[in-house]
């Protein structure tokens, strides 16, 4: 056997979508490295390219297909190149049908990531494509290897799937029903992260408030937070996402009492009109949401509240849209992720009449963003002169001569300082505020 053949194969993972996919890609990397692969510096030297995909919006799918076209032309020059395709798009039958003509060697789903090394070996042995996607979720497989990038912050899954079936959302169909990880497994992972030098963790779930249901033991999300708060070495804890319909007082009390829990709650409103909320199957009203905001600010003074907002949902009138703008005024979100409604085949909303023209959706999005950005700027300006505790993350991407850091309320703060501060919690005085970031200077009492 020649020297060339002895070299380990190299892989590259292309990740699209949410934090759940980022975490899945870390697991995929761990599985591949456990099978003898090494990570490639770039696509040109990879023997295996893995797509970990998102199907929440058409734009995400279009990016994937565009990149897949690029890789297919690369494969014509290098026929031995293997392409694996996973993530939420792989769960959709119509996508799998398209992939049969795209030069893909392995297709795997969200429920059988752990099988990837075996599927790759099968494809190489058969010299023909292997499509293996589980339609139904199985039991959670623990433990799985992981290959996280060195750093300060880490994502930790606490549950998988979703039972809410919002009418616009494909996630319950691609991620399956809710399954919670055992609390002991989660705490063990947090302890391992602390031992590896991570300072901050973000607990992930489609709806973290549902954590514990179906576990067979009496535990809810607040109980898990109290346990996580006691893990030595972890200095900050975040979580996402919270469904507004079931944020309990006990959860809010846990945020108030646990010193490591950051004062930031992402509670997606999605729309401000009760009629549209009902069509979305969100199971709460604008009045419920406003009371929730009152409760959040009562239990956690100064809490940062962020949201997702969708414009152009089928049947949304100008009056419905104005109600969303009104909620933005009333709540005054610290930040909001805003989206055009994206019609997803297989969801109930896709079958609704009165689909809104694209140009009208874009105009509404522009109006919404304009006002939300003004509010975010105003809130940030109120922080000028304040002292904020920040976790120093590293050199700023926009100005490597400065450091970037993050407040407990999840705001970016740029300041001047030495690299010895990276990884530390320090106090910074805010000197300037913009829409998406703050600027400051080290504060020494």
From Swiss-Prot:
Its cofactor is [4Fe-4S] cluster. It is found in: Cytoplasm. CDD domains: Radical_SAM (cd01335). Residues 148-378 form the Radical SAM core domain. InterPro entries: Elp3/MiaA/NifB-like_rSAM, Methylthiotransferase, Methylthiotransferase_CS, Methylthiotransferase_N, Methylthiotransferase_N_sf, MiaB_methiolase, rSAM, rSAM_horseshoe. [4Fe-4S] cluster 1 binds at residues 18, 54, 88. PROSITE patterns: MTTASE_N (PS51449), MTTASE_RADICAL (PS01278), RADICAL_SAM (PS51918), TRAM (PS50926). Binds 2 [4Fe-4S] clusters. One cluster is coordinated with 3 cysteines and an exchangeable S-adenosyl-L-methionine. It is an enzyme of class 2 (transferase). The keyword Thylakoid does not apply. GO terms for molecular function: 4 iron, 4 sulfur cluster binding; metal ion binding; N6-isopentenyladenosine methylthiotransferase activity. [4Fe-4S] cluster 2 binds at residues 162, 166, 169. It catalyses: N(6)-dimethylallyladenosine(37) in tRNA + (sulfur carrier)-SH + AH2 + 2 S-adenosyl-L-methionine = 2-methylsulfanyl-N(6)-dimethylallyladenosine(37) in tRNA + (sulfur carrier)-H + 5'-deoxyadenosine + L-methionine + A + S-adenosyl-L-homocysteine + 2 H(+). Residues 9-125 form the MTTase N-terminal domain. Keywords: 4Fe-4S, Cytoplasm, Iron, Iron-sulfur, Metal-binding, S-adenosyl-L-methionine, Transferase, tRNA processing. One of its GO terms (cellular component) is cytosol. Its EC number is 2.8.4.3. Residues 381-444 form the TRAM domain. Monomer. HAMAP family: tRNA_metthiotr_MiaB. Catalyzes the methylthiolation of N6-(dimethylallyl)adenosine (i(6)A), leading to the formation of 2-methylthio-N6-(dimethylallyl)adenosine (ms(2)i(6)A) at position 37 in tRNAs that read codons beginning with uridine. Belongs to the methylthiotransferase family. MiaB subfamily. This is tRNA-2-methylthio-N(6)-dimethylallyladenosine synthase.
């Amino acid at each position: 056997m020649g020297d060339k053949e002895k070299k380990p194969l190299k892989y590259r993972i292309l990740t699209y979508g949410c934090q759940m996919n980022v975490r899945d890609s870390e697991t995929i990397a761990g599985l591949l490295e456990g099978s003898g692969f090494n990570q490639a510096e770039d696509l040109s030297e990879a023997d295996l390219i893995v797509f970990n995909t998102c199907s929440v919006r058409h734009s995400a799918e279009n990016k994937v297909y565009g990149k897949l076209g690029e890789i297919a032309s690369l494969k014509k020059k290098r026929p031995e190149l293997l392409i694996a395709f996973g993530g939420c798009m792989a769960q959709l039958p119509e996508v799998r049908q398209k992939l049969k003509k795209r030069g893909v060697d392995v297709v795997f789903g969200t429920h059988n990531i752990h099988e990837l090394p075996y599927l790759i070996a099968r494809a190489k042995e058969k010299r023909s494509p292997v499509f293996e996607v589980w339609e139904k979720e199985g039991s959670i497989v623990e433990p799985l290897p992981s290959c996280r990038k060195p750093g300060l912050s880490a994502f930790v899954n606490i549950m998988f799937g979703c039972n809410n079936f919002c009418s616009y959302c494909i996630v319950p169909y691609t991620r399956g029903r809710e399954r919670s990880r055992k609390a002991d497994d989660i705490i063990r992972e947090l302890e391992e992260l602390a031992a590896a030098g991570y300072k901050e963790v973000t607990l992930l779930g489609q709806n973290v408030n549902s954590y514990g249901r179906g576990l067979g033991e009496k535990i809810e999300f607040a109980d898990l937070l109290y346990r996580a708060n006691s893990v030595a070495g972890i200095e900050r804890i975040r979580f996402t996402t919270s469904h507004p319909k079931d944020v309990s007082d006990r959860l809010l009390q846990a945020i108030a009492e646990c010193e490591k829990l950051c004062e930031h709650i992402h509670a997606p409103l999605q729309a401000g009109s009760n009629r549209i909320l009902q069509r979305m199957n969100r199971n709460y009203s604008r009045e419920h949401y406003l009371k929730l905001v009152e409760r959040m600010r009562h239990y956690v003074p100064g809490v940062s509240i962020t949201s997702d907002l969708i414009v152009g949902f089928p049947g949304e009138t100008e009056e419905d849209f104005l109600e969303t703008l009104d909620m933005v005024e009333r709540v005054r979100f610290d930040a909001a992720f805003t989206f055009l409604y994206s019609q997803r085949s297989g969801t109930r909303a896709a079958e609704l009449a009165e689909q809104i023209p694209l140009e009208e959706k874009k105009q509404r999005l522009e109006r919404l963003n304009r006002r939300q950005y003004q509010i975010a700027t105003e809130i940030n300006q109120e922080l000028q002169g304040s002292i904020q505790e920040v976790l120093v993350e590293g050199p700023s991407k926009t100005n490597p001569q400065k450091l970037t850091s993050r407040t407990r309320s999840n705001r970016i703060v740029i300041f001047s300082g030495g690299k010895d501060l990276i990884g530390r919690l320090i106090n910074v005085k805010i000197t300037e505020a913009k829409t998406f970031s703050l600027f400051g200077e080290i504060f020494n009492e």
